[in-house]
Design a protein with these regions (language model features):
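Class I SAM-dependent methyltransferase Rossmann-like catalytic core
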Residues: 23-33
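Core SAM-dependent methyltransferase catalytic element
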Residues: 189-209
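Conserved alpha-helix/loop element of class I SAM-dependent methyltransferases that forms part
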Residues: 31-46
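Conserved class I S-adenosyl-L-methionine
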Residues: 148-175
Length: 209
């Protein structure tokens, strides 16, 4: 009997389709995304100024706003008009008076300086100009401040090239570690199994020297 050959791209697409179908029955995000642990890793406190880079729908922005309090400031960054509109609507709807929505670019989040921390949640793999973005974030952080990156883990054994992984919305953490170091960050923590279910996600904590 002739063996059936299945391409890696086909299998990956099938896995993504299965994941999309499974998403209909996923538990609420608050039960698995581990937002409190992400904030703990950032080591931020009330009254501080932090950035949510590629903030998306603003899921983590709400947690950051509560953490830094009314005397702190959260800069929620997005690029597309649609995402910026969604963030502004969230800020208005939830009365997040300590959140400022910023329109960034693919290479520059347009952040103010001397920030006490920054985070990129589930979006690092989407950044096509990651080195320029990391450099800009580093310059916006005060010395000693932390950048926390959380993203989807690549499916083991299917794709090794960075671009192939990113096109399937995942990334091997080794690429992020290398890129963070190239941008001048120090790696202070790496958790390859930060989240196991329903999605495999890693977390890297990097410090601006």
């Amino acid at each position: 009997m002739r063996a059936l050959r299945v391409s890696g791209h086909l299998v990956a697409n099938l896995l993504l389709a299965a994941a999309a179908a499974r998403a209909q029955s996923l538990p609420p995000r608050d039960q698995w995304q581990r937002a409190p642990s992400i904030l703990e890793a950032m080591k931020i406190a009330g009254g501080q100024r932090v950035a949510d880079v590629a903030a998306g729908s603003g899921y983590l922005t709400r947690f950051l706003a509560a953490k830094v309090g009314t005397t702190g400031r959260v800069f929620a960054v997005e690029v597309s008009d649609e995402a910026l509109g969604a963030l502004r609507e969230l800020v208005k709807h939830d009365s997040l008076t300590n959140v400022e929505v910023l329109a960034g670019t693919e290479t520059d989040p347009k952040l103010p300086g001397s920030l006490d921390g920054a985070v990129i949640l589930n979006s690092y793999h989407e950044m096509t100009q990651h080195q320029a973005m990391l450099q800009a974030i580093k310059l916006a952080l005060r010395p000693g401040a932390l950048l926390v990156v959380v993203d989807n883990a690549a499916i083991a054994g299917w794709f090794t090239a960075r671009d192939d992984q990113a096109s399937h919305h995942a990334l091997d953490p080794k690429y992020a570690v290398e890129e963070l170091r190239n941008a001048g960050f120090e790696i202070v923590d790496r958790q390859d199994a930060f989240i196991v279910e329903p999605y495999a996600q890693w977390m890297i904590v990097a410090r601006r020297p």
